[in-house]
Amino acid sequence: MSRAEWDKVRGETEEWEGPREAYLEQVDDFGVETAAKIRTILDAMDFQQLIVFRYSDSDRVVAPFVVGVSSEGNALIRGYQVEGVSKSGKGPGWRVYQIKKMEKVVNYFEFFNVDDFDFDEFYPWTYKVFKML
């Protein structure tokens, strides 16, 4: 049971003040493969470019908005999926992906405009944040 679940059971919840900062020096803690994926995503975010990758046997094109870490310590990306379909049949929309499960992550070299998306930066769906647009 996570800390948040335990607090909920006990009736105690901390007031959410937003995500904590993760430090880029910590990227290597995820291992060589995941660190390389994180760096590719961060590079694309520097220029507001889409990324493409394979996830659950499906190709996805995503506008990355947040790269961070879950409360369980998993590297995550939150982004808007503009192309591709999930196993559940969902098409375009906001998604959270575990970076270690992403395959063949590359920069799509196509730009996107952050203002075209309804992004709530107060609640990025990560515990710690490496980068957020």
Each predicted region: which residue ranges?
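Short glycine- and basic-residue-enriched patches
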Residues: 1-133
